[in-house]
Amino acid sequence: MYREDYQRAAQAANQLLRSKNNRYLDSLDAGNLGTTQAIEPQVRSWSKLCGWRLTEDPQKDAQLPVQAAAHWLRTAALNGSDAVFYLQKAENNLSLLYGSAQPPTFSSLLPGCRMELVPCFSPATYQISGILVGTLHTERLADAVAADTALRDIYIAVLSLPLSDRNVEQLLQKDSALLGQLRAYATADYVSGSSTRRVVQRPVGSIPQAVTCLENEIDNLRKNQGTGFAYTAIRFGAASQEQYRRLLALLTGAMQSENTEASFEPVRWFTLSPTVRPLAIPTAVEQNKVLHIVSLNTLQDAAVACTPPQRSYPGFWLEGQSDEQLFPAVEAFHSSGLAMKIGTAIETSEPVMLSQ
């Protein structure tokens, strides 16, 4: 009976290590993913962010968009709503859309925020698309994509399925209970020596690694319990194989991290069938359970991934940038009053009007 208890504990540890941080995905390829039970974020309202007005404080200008995205995600989580940050480039024209149950209240945090409701928005279908999961340790993702002029017909979508505070507490309790059970079997007594017999403790199988994994996850849950968590995935696609490979390299490069703790989930990706909808999350089967391909992330990390660019681009204009910052991305503007045509914008071929 004593030996059987250790065997059951070792088996539970192996199963836990395979499931935590999506390690089971390492043995799968895209052909193992299912789409019949795929889910899509439930979004009722889409809003396009066209730009905002910078302050005179560069540090504040860098913090405000992150705070706005974090507030948007936290509000969605408290309302039990999914959220999607959708970035699209079409011939270098940039579109940034935020989707959730209600329009985001960015204007309360971003000065001069310009947002437009986009009724009946439907994401475009691309020739080739994929899904990427992992810990969202990334900064200025939108800038990296927008600034790459070789990416002319692509999209990325950061999908966020927030956990309620109650779900986080339940996960914390489940992990804590399992941790207590595994700790009791992490080591076993062994008799060493013949003439001078002594008892030493040795680790049992992978139980110590499972204990460390649980400790890291519990620590992460407790540290960020007040700000929230979400299951996330990044869907992305392009109009050609060349652009798809370039976009994939950019995304994986942007999500590199020096974090080597057991709670850190490495980046994994799969190229999907063209029939998979652009915001769908496919499934995989693990231990006879159907699991959706998502990663557990803090809302704060998800917010950083959903942050708009810190420079102007065609289709997205930051008011107050210096001339040398704005020049490559200057866009045509229109005045509601008297105006005089002074030329044609190179990027958009639209008439440029000078207000009188």
Residue ranges and their predicted role:
Residues 1-334, 339-345:
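Extended, folded cores of ATP/NTP-driven motor/assembly subunits in large transport
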Residues 341-356:
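Glycine-rich phosphate-binding loop of nucleotide-binding enzymes
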